[in-house]
């Protein structure tokens, strides 16, 4: 009984909905009924009770429930095992008596359902016929038709015909072969196989027999018979045309349970009429000439072939259409040849019937002629009978007679479809004294039927028809024809609203193609019918207004917005309830189910209840998710789920009474809510702006936007966040001296008003590739330095030198750097930024270091963009122009001689693209440091890698080489200190020997004087990066790139070489590790092998690797801490370093000699000038010193 109770609740919940009932609701009711099939008697009784008790507007939905249940049951269990159909049929008469209490405009829908049942054999004709008669009795048109038949005295034959129709179900159509081979003819043949069809054939033959001059009396008699038949057909004939049983498809699709149910019915009627006319036209030629007057009654059968007639009782003009054709017997002879030609044309799918201008494809046969779209102006369009326009004897309109001259192509003796045959002499079709009773007068366009201008529209339909014709099912084809006709009525409308009608048509064809003909037909008809219905109801309204309304409504439906209620605010929920979840289901499972539909704002899991509440960002996404997931059997963790709208959080308890769970909307009357409360309603939902009180309009917009973009807030948050990181890179431009600063704004343009302030977070504006001047810069202006590296702290001000440094040099130096920078300057600036990015802590540390180290360190570490600044620092030393970049004290200060940071010492100038460090720079590959592909940290581990990172010869590094990032660094990568470095560098045997010797000496010294070395290292962190380059091409770097290295750099490097610990023990330990590993076999041999070129490449790679490694390390807070500690220790050791500088320098000189004899001499000089820090010498020294340092360490340790 639970299933029964569930069905009962589901069914009676219809009362809570406004009529047109949605297809989704029908499906739910049908499923509930099928689940309760074991108690099917209860289900049937519940439905009957509902129909009996419900309001008139719910009668037709009740009928749709019966239809849906029976069809689904027949489809699912088979016609033999279906229990619902027989059970409903037991009390169906009483049920239909209640059904006919529906509004008059809904009766056509009931007839349509009956016709479908007859066509598909859902119920026997014996059951359906009385129901159709009942409908006829209730409709005005039916009585008129009956009168006509009575006049003829052939009413009984029609009745017989109707009874016969059931006997010869339209489903059985063996006679098809008799007709010419074509889909159209096949359909017609099937129709004719029925008894009614045979009668129609006879009638056609009868028409053929009489010559054109047939007496009007005969015509009138025939017409009377035809009318009688049509009246009967109105009751049941429509059924045959729709023989197609398509239970396979969503059975509910046939009916629109949607907003426009009426339209569907109308369309079906029209379709039936069209089919009948086409069938008649096609059949006429094939029909043997054995027509009997008595056959005339059979005409109803023919009309039956065109299901629309049954609807005629409702004033469906189409029914009478056939009659007019018959009335024009005189023309029949001429008419038939034309019909034949038309049929052939249609068979050939010659879409344009020249006469009609209609596409033959519609009718499948010569149906095109039947299409009234071509009716003469003022003549009702056949097949376009307006529902609600009962035309009691009018048979002409709905059924264009086959062979009937298309409008503009009146065929003599051929009734114009939609042209009243009865007292309307048709041009070329004079029917003397044969006015059709109830036939619309030619001058009487049928209401709702576009008269003139119809012809143009037909072509549109034809295009669709062909798509249908391919379908072999005669019924589907007929329906298509009917559809075409139906739409034709809208042709005038189409003209006016060409876009819409075309849209609907073009859309419907697609639907037809993809779905069963019946459904597509319905949808198309629904549209066209609804249009005609609208015309009837709102004739005064402009069609353009209707079209706009329809389009707006369609857009709203697509957005998932519910119907608008007057003076009611709609708060549309974007919250979905998903139930029957397995308790093991996780948020990720639910998110994966719904994220395909759109962004999810939040997911609230309630495992004990096995459900979740999902708030989607957009209503449309939630609507699509609900539509899709509610139809299929979707599973999460192998368990089927349920999904429904959930009341959004913003709705307070007071307003829950207004919640509509079916539509997922809370309709709150304007007078119940205050404008200021609206915003609070948006949580988990959105306001429908179209439903807001104009007085509030301003207020809601805000909430609405927020709601509509429930993710909006998130997005904004996200943006700010991302900008911050991005800005970090941007700041670099600020590094340049003030002049550059002015220029930089363009780089940072989007977010950084003043590039100078590196610290300010810069939105995600990225500077163009460094090589290209930013948009704002003139060609002559040096490009601003590259944006700060991502790690640069937003607040970092490149212009601000560390405490120990002089203020930035005068701008002039900048210009020289500009010339120098071509490739390198930006990278250098980046290093500064790097330090900044690391954070203020780093900058502070670096500042400490700088204070202790003094300017020399700065020049060493950051030569590039800050060059302008460094110039001032180094300006004294004359390094200003070229070296200025190299000398950037500020950058050094930022990075500091930080143990952890590799003083990024890059040759001045823009870094090569591969070295440039802005991940966002489009042109550049990810900067090496950014990539985590570097070898594991070198001997130093993550500890403070030796600062010497860069070997002089290679192109500058990514803006910042991380400690250990530079191959040359003693840091973790292969570098001068690393094993790979050794391999990379080819030194001449002499150099190797010297280096080894020096290394040994240095190691000893280091052990003795670790602090001084460390301090020196601090002072000259940058040079350490460039050791290799110096060896390779010491002079080159001396000239411009590495001029900043101090003579004491070698020792400093060695001091640093301890790899993160300045203690000699550590150094020995790390050094031995690296030396043993790298140097054990390779020391001399590898050094000897190395050539500057090889070193250069190796260094680049190593640098990139290390920089990546170092970068990561630096970022690591632990690394920073260790660096800080080391820095502090260095600060202490700096004094010692100064004391021991002499000894170290002595050592360094030999080392430099090892690297290069030239370097050695310069190193000696450098040593003397260590305090001064000459850029030229320092680079050479640094490079040479670094390598010797490593070599010596390794040599000394290896023996150990």
From Swiss-Prot:
<dbReference type="Pfam" id="PF04818">
    <property type="entry name" value="CID"/>
</dbReference>
<feature type="compositionally biased region" description="Basic residues">
    <location>
        <begin position="504"/>
        <end position="541"/>
    </location>
</feature>
<feature type="modified residue" description="Phosphoserine">
    <location>
        <position position="154"/>
    </location>
</feature>
<feature type="region of interest" description="Disordered">
    <location>
        <begin position="927"/>
        <end position="1200"/>
    </location>
</feature>
<feature type="compositionally biased region" description="Low complexity">
    <location>
        <begin position="462"/>
        <end position="471"/>
    </location>
</feature>
<feature type="compositionally biased region" description="Polar residues">
    <location>
        <begin position="1153"/>
        <end position="1162"/>
    </location>
</feature>
<feature type="compositionally biased region" description="Basic and acidic residues">
    <location>
        <begin position="543"/>
        <end position="558"/>
    </location>
</feature>
<dbReference type="GO" id="GO:0005634">
    <property type="term" value="C:nucleus"/>
</dbReference>
<feature type="compositionally biased region" description="Basic and acidic residues">
    <location>
        <begin position="1063"/>
        <end position="1139"/>
    </location>
</feature>
<keyword id="KW-0539">Nucleus</keyword>
<keyword id="KW-0805">Transcription regulation</keyword>
<dbReference type="InterPro" id="IPR035979">
    <property type="entry name" value="RBD_domain_sf"/>
</dbReference>
<feature type="compositionally biased region" description="Gly residues">
    <location>
        <begin position="965"/>
        <end position="978"/>
    </location>
</feature>
<feature type="region of interest" description="Disordered">
    <location>
        <begin position="346"/>
        <end position="566"/>
    </location>
</feature>
<feature type="modified residue" description="Phosphoserine">
    <location>
        <position position="1178"/>
    </location>
</feature>
<feature type="compositionally biased region" description="Pro residues">
    <location>
        <begin position="399"/>
        <end position="461"/>
    </location>
</feature>
<keyword id="KW-0804">Transcription</keyword>
<dbReference type="InterPro" id="IPR051485">
    <property type="entry name" value="SR-CTD_assoc_factor"/>
</dbReference>
<feature type="modified residue" description="Phosphoserine">
    <location>
        <position position="1058"/>
    </location>
</feature>
<protein>
    <recommendedName>
        <fullName>SR-related and CTD-associated factor 4</fullName>
    </recommendedName>
</protein>
<feature type="compositionally biased region" description="Polar residues">
    <location>
        <begin position="140"/>
        <end position="153"/>
    </location>
</feature>
<dbReference type="InterPro" id="IPR000504">
    <property type="entry name" value="RRM_dom"/>
</dbReference>
<keyword id="KW-0597">Phosphoprotein</keyword>
<feature type="region of interest" description="Disordered">
    <location>
        <begin position="696"/>
        <end position="724"/>
    </location>
</feature>
<feature type="modified residue" description="Phosphoserine">
    <location>
        <position position="722"/>
    </location>
</feature>
<dbReference type="GO" id="GO:2000805">
    <property type="term" value="P:negative regulation of termination of RNA polymerase II transcription, poly(A)-coupled"/>
</dbReference>
<dbReference type="Pfam" id="PF00076">
    <property type="entry name" value="RRM_1"/>
</dbReference>
<comment type="function">
    <text>Anti-terminator protein required to prevent early mRNA termination during transcription. Together with SCAF8, acts by suppressing the use of early, alternative poly(A) sites, thereby preventing the accumulation of non-functional truncated proteins. Mechanistically, associates with the phosphorylated C-terminal heptapeptide repeat domain (CTD) of the largest RNA polymerase II subunit (POLR2A), and subsequently binds nascent RNA upstream of early polyadenylation sites to prevent premature mRNA transcript cleavage and polyadenylation.</text>
</comment>
<feature type="region of interest" description="Disordered">
    <location>
        <begin position="140"/>
        <end position="172"/>
    </location>
</feature>
<feature type="compositionally biased region" description="Pro residues">
    <location>
        <begin position="856"/>
        <end position="868"/>
    </location>
</feature>
<feature type="compositionally biased region" description="Pro residues">
    <location>
        <begin position="927"/>
        <end position="958"/>
    </location>
</feature>
<feature type="domain" description="RRM">
    <location>
        <begin position="574"/>
        <end position="648"/>
    </location>
</feature>
<dbReference type="InterPro" id="IPR034369">
    <property type="entry name" value="SCAF4_RRM"/>
</dbReference>
<feature type="region of interest" description="Disordered">
    <location>
        <begin position="834"/>
        <end position="875"/>
    </location>
</feature>
<dbReference type="GO" id="GO:0003723">
    <property type="term" value="F:RNA binding"/>
</dbReference>
<feature type="compositionally biased region" description="Basic and acidic residues">
    <location>
        <begin position="493"/>
        <end position="503"/>
    </location>
</feature>
<feature type="domain" description="CID">
    <location>
        <begin position="1"/>
        <end position="139"/>
    </location>
</feature>
<comment type="subunit">
    <text>Interacts with POLR2A; via C-terminal heptapeptide repeat domain (CTD) phosphorylated at 'Ser-2' and 'Ser-5'.</text>
</comment>
<feature type="compositionally biased region" description="Pro residues">
    <location>
        <begin position="367"/>
        <end position="390"/>
    </location>
</feature>
<feature type="modified residue" description="N6-acetyllysine">
    <location>
        <position position="49"/>
    </location>
</feature>
<dbReference type="GO" id="GO:0006397">
    <property type="term" value="P:mRNA processing"/>
</dbReference>
<dbReference type="InterPro" id="IPR012677">
    <property type="entry name" value="Nucleotide-bd_a/b_plait_sf"/>
</dbReference>
């Amino acid at each position: 009984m639970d299933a029964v109770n569930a069905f009962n609740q589901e069914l009676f919940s219809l009362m809570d909905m406004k009529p047109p009932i949605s297809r989704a609701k029908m499906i739910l009711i049908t499923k509930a009924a099928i689940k309760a099939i074991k108690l099917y008697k209860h289900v049937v009784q519940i439905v009957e009770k509902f129909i009996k008790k419900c309001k008139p507007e719910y009668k037709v939905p009740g009928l749709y429930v019966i239809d849906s249940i029976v069809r689904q049951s027949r489809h699912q269990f088979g016609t033999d095992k279906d229990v619902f159909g027989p059970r409903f049929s037991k009390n169906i008469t009483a049920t239909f008596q209640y059904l006919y209490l529906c509004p008059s405009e809904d009766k056509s829908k009931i007839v349509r359902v009956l016709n479908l049942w007859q066509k598909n054999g859902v119920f026997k004709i014996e059951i359906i016929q009385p129901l159709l008669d009942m409908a006829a009795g209730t409709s005005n048109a039916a009585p008129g038709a009956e009168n006509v038949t009575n006049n003829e005295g052939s009413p009984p034959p029609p009745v017989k015909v109707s009874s016969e129709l059931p006997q010869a179900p339209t489903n059985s159509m063996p006679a098809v072969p008799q007709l010419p081979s074509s889909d159209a003819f096949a359909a017609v043949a099937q129709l004719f196989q029925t008894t009614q069809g045979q009668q129609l054939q006879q009638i056609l033959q009868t028409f053929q027999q009489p010559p054109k001059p047939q007496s009007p009396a005969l015509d009138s008699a025939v017409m009377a018979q035809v009318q009688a038949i049509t009246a009967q057909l109105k009751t049941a004939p429509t059924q045959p045309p729709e023989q197609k049983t398509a239970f396979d498809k969503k059975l509910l699709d046939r009916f629109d349970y949607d907003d426009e149910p009426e339209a569907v019915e109308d369309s079906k009627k029209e379709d039936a009429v069209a089919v009948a006319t086409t069938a008649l036209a096609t059949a006429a030629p094939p029909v043997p000439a054995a027509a009997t007057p008595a056959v005339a009654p059979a005409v109803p059968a023919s009309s039956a072939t065109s299901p629309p007639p049954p609807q005629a009782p409702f004033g469906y003009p189409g029914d009478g259409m056939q009659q007019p054709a018959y009335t024009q017997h005189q023309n029949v002879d001429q008419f038939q040849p034309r019909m034949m030609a038309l049929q052939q044309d249609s068979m050939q799918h010659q879409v344009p019937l020249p006469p009609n201008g209609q596409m033959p494809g519609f009718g499948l046969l010569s149906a095109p002629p039947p299409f009234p779209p071509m009716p003469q102006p003022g003549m009702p369009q056949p097949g376009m009978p307006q529902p609600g326009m009962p035309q009691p004897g009018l048979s002409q309109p709905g059924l264009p007679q086959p062979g009937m001259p298309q409008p503009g192509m009146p065929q003599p003796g051929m009734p114009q479809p939609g042209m009243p045959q009865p007292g309307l002499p048709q041009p070329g079709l004079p029917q003397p004294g044969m006015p059709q009773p109830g036939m619309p007068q030619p001058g009487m366009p049928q209401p709702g039927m576009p008269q003139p201008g119809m012809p143009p529209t037909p072509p549109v339909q034809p295009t669709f028809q062909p798509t249908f014709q391919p379908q072999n099912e005669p019924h589907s084809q007929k329906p298509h024809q009917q559809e075409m006709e139906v739409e034709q009525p809208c042709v005038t409308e189409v003209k006016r609203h060409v876009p819409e009608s075309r849209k609907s048509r073009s859309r419907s064809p697609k639907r037809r193609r993809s779905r069963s003909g019946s459904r597509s037909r319905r949808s198309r008809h629904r549209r066209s019918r609804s249009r005609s219905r609208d015309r009837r109801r709102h004739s005064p309204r402009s069609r353009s207004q209707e079209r706009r309304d329809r389009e707006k409504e369609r857009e709203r439906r697509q957005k998932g917005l519910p119907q608008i209620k007057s003076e009611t605010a709609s708060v549309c929920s974007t919250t979905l309830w998903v139930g029957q979840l397995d308790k093991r289901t996780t948020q990720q499972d639910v998110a994966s189910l719904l994220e395909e539909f759109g962004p999810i704002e939040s997911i609230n899991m309630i495992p004990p209840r096995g459900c979740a509440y999902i708030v989607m960002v957009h209503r449309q996404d939630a609507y699509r998710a609900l539509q899709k997931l509610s139809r299929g059997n979707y599973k999460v963790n192998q368990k089927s789920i349920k999904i429904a709208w959930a009341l959004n959080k913003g709705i307070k308890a007071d307003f829950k009474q207004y919640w509509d769970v079916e539509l997922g909307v809370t309709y709150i009357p304007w007078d119940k809510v205050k404008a200021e409360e609206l915003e609070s309603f948006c949580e988990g939902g959105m306001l429908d702006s179209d439903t807001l009180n104009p007085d509030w309009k301003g207020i809601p917009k805000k909430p609405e936007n927020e709601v509509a973009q429930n993710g909006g807030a998130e997005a904004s948050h996200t943006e700010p966040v991302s900008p911050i990181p991005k800005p970090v890179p941007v700041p670099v431009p600020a590094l340049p001296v003030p002049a550059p600063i002015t220029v930089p704004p363009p780089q940072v343009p989007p977010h950084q008003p003043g590039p100078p302030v590196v610290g300010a977070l810069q939105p995600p504006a990225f500077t163009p590739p460094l090589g290209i001047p930013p948009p704002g810069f003139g060609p002559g202006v040096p490009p601003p330095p590259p944006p700060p590296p991502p790690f640069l702290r937003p607040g970092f001000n490149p212009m601000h030198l560390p405490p120990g440094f002089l203020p930035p040099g005068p701008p002039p130096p900048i210009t020289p750097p500009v010339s120098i920078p071509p490739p390198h300057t930006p990278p250098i600036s980046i290093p500064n930024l790097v330090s900044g990015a690391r954070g203020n802590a780093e900058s502070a540390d670096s500042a400490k270091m700088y204070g202790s180290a003094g300017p020399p360190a700065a020049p060493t570490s950051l030569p590039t963009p800050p060059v302008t600044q460094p110039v001032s620092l180094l300006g004294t030393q004359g390094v200003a122009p070229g070296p200025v970049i190299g000398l950037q004290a500020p950058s050094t200060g930022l990075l500091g001689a930080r143990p952890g940071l590799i003083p990024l010492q890059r040759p001045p100038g823009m870094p090569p693209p591969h070295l440039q460090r802005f991940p966002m720079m489009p042109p550049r590959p990810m900067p090496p440091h950014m990539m985590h592909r570097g070898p594991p940290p070198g001997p130093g581990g993550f500890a403070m890698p030796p600062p010497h990172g860069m070997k002089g010869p290679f192109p500058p590094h990514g803006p910042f080489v991380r400690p250990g990032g530079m191959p040359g660094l003693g840091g973790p990568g292969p570098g001068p200190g690393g094993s790979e470095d050794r391999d990379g560098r080819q030194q001449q045997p002499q150099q190797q020997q010297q280096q080894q010797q020096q290394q040994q000496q240095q190691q000893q010294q280091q052990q003795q004087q670790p602090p001084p070395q460390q301090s020196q290292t601090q002072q000259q962190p940058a040079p350490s990066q460039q050791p290799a380059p110096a060896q390779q091409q010491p002079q080159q770097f001396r000239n411009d790139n590495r001029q900043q290295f101090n003579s004491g750099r070698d020792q400093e490097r060695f001091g640093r070489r301890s790899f993160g610990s300045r203690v000699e023990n550590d150094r020995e330990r790390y050094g031995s590790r690296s030396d043993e590993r790298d140097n054990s076999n390779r020391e001399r041999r590898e050094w000897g092998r190395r050539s500057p070129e090889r070193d250069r490449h190796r260094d680049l790679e190593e640098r990139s690797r290390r920089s990546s490694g170092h970068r990561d390390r630096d970022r690591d807070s632990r690394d920073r801490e260790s660096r800080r500690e080391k820095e502090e220790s260095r600060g202490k050791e700096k004094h010692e370093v100064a004391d021991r500088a002499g000894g170290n320098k002595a050592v360094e000189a030999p080392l430099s000699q090892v690297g290069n004899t030239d370097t050695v001499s310069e190193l000696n000089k450098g040593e003397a000038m260590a305090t001064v820090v000459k850029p030229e010498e320092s680079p050479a020294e640094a490079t040479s010193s670094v390598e010797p340092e490593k070599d010596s360490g390794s040599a000394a340790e290896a023996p150990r």
